[in-house]
Amino acid sequence: MSAPSPVANGKAEASGTAAEEQSPIHILWINAGLSCDGDSVSLTAATQPSIEEIALSVLPGLPPVAVHWPLIDFECGPVQGADNFIEWFFKGERGEIDPFVLVIEGSIPNEAIKPEGYWCGFGDNPETGQPITTSEWIDRLAPKALAVVAIGTCAAYGGIHAMEGNPTGAMGVPDYLGWDWKSKAGIPIVCVPGCPIQPDNFSETLVYLLYQATGQAPMIPLDEHLRPLWLFGSTVHEGCDRAGYYEQGQFATTYDSPKCLVKLGCWGPVVKCNVPKRGWMNGIGGCPNVGGICIGCTMPGFPDKFMPFMDEPPGGKVSSTASSAYGAVIRRLRNVTAQTLDKEPKWRRTGEKLTTGYRPPW
């Protein structure tokens, strides 16, 4: 998916403006890992910015962009043919489109443990007619990419497909390439987890990388698990509208309650995610905002360490018991203060005498 006017066959058309003369930054998107395509679907809801704003390069200072995304790539292949969409990826391998950002969706299966066949592939080898595995594409393209972005928890850390007992040996991109891996531009793997992603988190991260590629932003700040620090630096609890109830020791026992959901299985106090603050679409929604528990889907230990999802977290029993004890005292003190503050001052009344305490100078 890309803007039709400035880019054709990877070359800029001459039109007199600096933006149109500039070669585009290509986005090569591989969604052939083990996944449900939920991250691609989620991204269509992005608004800050939207994928259309990125593809059309309408944001101030954003370079021309050509997005080659299997979900909605309306330009298809380099010669406008649906049958050769995969040619963009061969061009990336041959170095004919540069720079490009490699986006990987889905966890990476271990092809080495399979004696025959393959776990997942993306396009065919034109010489043999056999599928090219997802891991082989990563081997071919990652060394030539400006940056590698793992979209969704499956690509970031393995996710559901990498659960204990899985037959594929699935893993995340950092597990496959190495956690210390860096692109030719010196950029670490960038992980935007979520099951699926919060759409604006990914679009904002992608825009940051595009600005960085053109020298308009410093090196992207990441935490120890390669997540953008400004997006995943706080916990769900720290941005949750229900956090005040936790402090006061008030916990929901049913899902129709507005109180804290910890006893119903919410992991918000320890999960790094900004969904309660950011919402989901146009700032609306987000798991605890609409009555859902946080199941830890942005964390490297998801899902194994958070199961079973509907049970109270082990540490929650201790913390909620302690919170209930001191929360009762806090509530009582606040009620006393509230009763004092919930009354008008006594001097606001009728009468012939001024009782506000004002002393006239005459």
State the predicted function of each range:
Residues 99-114:
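Short acidic, glycine-rich surface-loop motifs adjacent to enzyme active sites
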Residues 36, 110-112, 156-160, 198-201:
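Short, well-ordered, mixed-charge alpha-helical segments that flank or form enzyme active sites
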Residues 28, 147-152, 190-192:
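Hydrophobic/aromatic beta-strand patches that form the interior of the parallel beta-sheet core
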Residues 111-131, 159-166:
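Glycine/threonine-rich flexible loop motifs
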Residues 129-145:
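Catalytic-core regions built around general acid/base machinery
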Residues 1-85, 89-103, 186-189, 204-362:
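Iron-sulfur (Fe-S) cluster-binding modules
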Residues 98-100, 144-147:
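Loop/turn elements at helix/coil->beta-strand transitions in domains of secreted/extracellular proteins
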Residues 154, 158-185, 190, 194:
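Class I SAM-dependent methyltransferase SAM-binding "motif I" and its flanking Rossmann-like core
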